[in-house]
C-alpha cells in the first residue's frame, strides 16, 4: 500500500532504552531480517535502530555499519531522539532525528526543532515561550548540522477524555483508566462538563498541531517531521494525544480537508508577527509556498482577501522540492471602534492550494473604569467594604502575587500526560461561554484560539474547591483528568448585596503591550457596569479569601 500511495516508510527496530553491546547483538538479526524481507519495497526509505536510546554509542554505530554493508541502498540512523536532553551528532548516520540540537554558538545550550515540549518536563518550545505569530522557524537550529534534520514526535498534545468511549472497550481492553478518570470528574463536580472539555481541548490540540507542522514547512532545508501518531495512546499513563481516538475515528476537531491545508504536498504559508492587532495599523505578511509534490508549477498568482480588502501577487514558477518565496502582502486594517475577527484567505494558482489564518483587530483606546465600579487586584478590606455596601468590584490577578495553588498559565495542552510529567501546568486549554455578555466586546470561540496565546500564558487559574459547587465560570481552565481540579479564569459571584467579577489575568499590566488584554478588560468593565451583571451564586467573603489568598 505504501508503495502504491507514495508513502516514505521510516522503520525502527523494536527497542527503546539503554544500549549495550548485548542489545546490539540481539537486534542485529532483527534488522537483517527486515532488510531481507522488505528491502525490495521502494517505500522503505529509512531504517533506524529504535527510539530514544541511551548508552553505548559505539555499539550503535557498529550495528549501523553492519546493516549498511548488507544493504547500502537504505538511509540509516542510530535512533530517533537519542540521548534526549543532550543529543549529539552520530557518526555514519544519514539524517538526524531529534527534538533539539546543540546551539551553533559553541555554548552548552540546546535549541529546539519542534514547537512544544522539546524537553517534556519543561515547557520550552516556541508555542509556550515564543513571541506568537507565524514567523518562527528552525533555520538557526539546523544551521550547524551537516545532516538533514527531522523533528521527532512533534505534537503530543493531551486532550480531555470522551467518556462515551468506555462502553466500546470490552474484555481485556476494558477502559478502567477512563472509568477512574470519570469517577474523579464526578467527585469534583465536573462530569457534566466532560463533553465540552473534550471538544475544546481537541480543538486547541488541532491548532497547535497546525503550527507545529507549518513551522517545519517554513524552515528552508528542513529534513521533515514525525508526528508521534494521529490516534490516542491508551497506555503509559493514558496519553490521549490524538486527533483521532483509539478506534481511529475523528474527534471532530478538524476535518481531513482542513488538515490538508497545512499538511500536503504543497502548502501556502503566511509569515506575520502576531494574530492580534490594533485597529488602523498596517498588516504585513510574507507569503511562501512549500512545494514537495511530484511536478514543477508554471508561473501563476496568489489571490488573497482580508475582511473587505482583496488582491493578488504574482507567483513565479515553482520547482518541486523546497520552500519558495512569493512576496509581501500589505493591508491597512479597519479603523474599527469595536473588536472584530478577520480571516486572511490565500489561494495559489495553478496548484489550487488554499490556506487561511484568523486575525483579531482591537480598538486602540483604553476604556476608563466606569463611575461607581472598583477595579482592584486584591480581595482586601476595601473590596469587602464596597461589596458589603452593595457595590460592584472587578478583581484582576496580580502578576507579582499569584493566587495560591494556581497551576499557572499555559496556552498549549499538557504534553503526553500529567501523570508522567508533573512540573508543568498540566492544563488542557480553555472552555469558554462564548455567548456570555461579559465577552460581548471580545470575539471568541468556545475554545482557546490565537487571541488567547499571550493571555493564557500569563493566566492564574483560580482553584474553586472552596467555592460553591454550583458556580460555573464564564471561562474555565480545563484541568487534566488525573488531577481533576475545578479551575476558573473568569467567574462572577454575589457577595452579600454586592457583585464581584473575578479574572485570573493581570489585564491592566498585560494591556500595556497586548491589545487583546485591553479589549478583554474593556469588555469586562462594560459588563460589570451594566444591568446584565447579576450574579446568582452567593459566596461568603471568607470563602473568597481562601480561594484568592489562601
Residue spans of the language-model regions?
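Extracytoplasmic/secreted cell-surface and envelope-processing proteins
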Residues: 18-20, 56-59, 86-87, 395-396, ...
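Substrate-binding/catalytic cleft of secreted carbohydrate-active enzymes
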Residues: 1-245
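Catalytic beta-strand/loop cores that center a nucleophilic Ser/Cys/Thr
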Residues: 122-136, 402, 419-515, 532-550
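Beta-strand-rich binding/interaction modules
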Residues: 280-316, 326-333, 338-349
Amino acid at each position: 500500500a505504501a508503495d502504491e500511495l507514495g508513502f516514505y516508510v521510516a522503520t525502527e527496530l523494536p527497542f527503546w532504552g539503554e544500549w549495550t553491546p548485548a542489545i546490539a547483538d540481539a537486534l542485529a538479526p532483527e534488522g537483517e531480517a527486515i532488510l531481507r524481507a522488505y528491502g525490495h519495497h521502494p517505500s522503505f526509505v529509512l531504517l533506524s535502530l529504535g527510539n530514544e536510546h541511551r548508552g553505548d554509542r559505539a555499539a550503535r554505530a557498529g550495528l549501523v555499519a553492519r546493516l549498511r554493508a548488507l544493504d547500502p541502498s537504505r538511509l540509516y540512523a542510530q535512533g530517533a531522539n537519542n540521548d534526549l536532553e543532550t543529543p549529539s551528532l552520530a557518526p555514519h548516520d544519514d539524517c538526524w532525528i531529534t527534538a533539539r540540537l546543540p546551539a551553533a554558538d559553541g555554548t552548552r545550550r540546546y535549541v529546539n526543532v519542534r514547537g512544544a515540549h522539546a524537553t517534556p518536563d519543561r515547557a520550552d518550545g516556541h508555542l509556550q515561550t515564543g513571541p506568537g505569530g507565524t514567523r518562527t522557524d528552525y533555520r538557526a537550529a539546523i544551521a550547524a548540522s551537516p545532516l538533514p534534520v527531522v523533528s521527532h514526535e512533534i505534537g503530543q498534545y493531551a486532550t480531555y477524555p470522551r467518556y462515551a468511549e468506555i462502553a466500546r472497550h470490552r474484555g481485556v481492553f476494558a477502559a478502567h483508566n477512563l472509568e477512574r478518570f470519570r469517577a474523579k470528574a464526578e467527585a469534583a463536580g465536573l462530569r457534566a462538563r466532560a463533553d465540552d472539555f473534550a471538544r475544546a481541548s481537541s480543538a486547541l490540540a488541532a491548532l497547535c498541531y497546525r503550527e507545529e507542522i507549518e513551522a517545519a514547512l517554513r524552515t528552508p532545508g528542513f529534513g521533515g517531521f514525525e508526528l508521534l501518531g494521529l490516534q490516542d495512546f491508551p497506555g503509559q499513563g493514558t496519553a490521549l494525544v490524538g486527533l483521532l481516538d483509539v478506534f481511529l475515528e475523528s474527534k471532530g476537531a478538524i476535518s481531513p480537508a482542513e488538515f490538508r491545508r497545512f499538511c500536503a504536498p504543497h502548502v501556502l504559508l503566511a509569515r506575520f508577527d502576531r494574530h492580534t492587532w490594533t485597529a488602523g495599523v498596517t498588516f504585513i505578511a510574507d507569503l511562501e509556498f512549500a512545494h514537495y509534490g511530484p511536478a514543477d508549477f508554471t508561473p501563476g498568482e496568489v489571490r488573497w482577501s482580508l475582511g473587505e480588502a482583496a488582491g493578488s501577487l504574482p507567483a513565479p514558477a515553482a520547482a518541486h522540492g523546497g520552500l519558495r518565496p512569493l512576496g509581501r502582502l500589505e493591508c491597512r486594517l479597519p479603523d474599527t471602534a469595536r473588536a472584530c475577527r478577520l480571516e486572511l484567505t490565500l489561494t495559489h494558482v495553478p496548484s489550487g492550494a488554499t490556506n487561511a489564518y484568523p486575525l483579531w483587530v482591537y480598538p486602540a483606546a483604553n476604556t476608563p473604569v466606569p463611575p461607581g465600579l472598583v477595579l482592584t487586584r486584591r480581595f482586601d478590606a476595601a473590596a469587602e467594604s464596597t461589596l458589603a455596601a452593595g457595590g460592584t468590584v472587578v478583581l484582576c490577578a496580580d502578576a507579582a502575587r499569584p493566587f495560591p495553588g494556581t497551576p499557572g498559565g499555559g496556552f498549549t495542552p499538557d504534553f503526553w500526560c500529567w501523570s508522567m510529567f508533573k512540573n508543568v501546568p498540566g492544563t488542557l486549554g480553555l472552555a469558554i461561554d462564548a455567548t456570555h455578555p461579559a465577552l460581548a466586546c471580545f470575539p471568541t470561540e468556545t475554545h482557546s484560539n490565537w487571541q488567547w496565546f499571550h493571555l493564557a500564558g500569563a493566566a492564574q487559574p483560580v482553584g474553586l474547591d472552596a467555592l460553591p459547587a454550583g458556580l460555573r465560570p464564564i471561562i474555565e481552565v480545563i484541568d487534566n483528568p488525573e488531577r481533576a481540579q475545578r479551575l476558573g479564569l473568569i467567574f462572577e459571584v454575589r457577595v452579600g448585596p454586592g457583585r464581584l467579577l473575578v479574572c485570573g489575568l493581570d489585564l491592566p499590566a498585560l494591556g500595556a503591550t497586548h491589545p487583546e488584554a485591553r479589549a478583554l478588560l474593556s469588555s469586562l468593565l462594560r459588563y460589570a457596569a451594566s444591568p446584565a451583571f447579576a450574579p446568582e451564586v452567593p459566596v461568603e467573603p471568607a470563602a473568597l479569601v481562601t480561594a484568592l489568598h489562601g
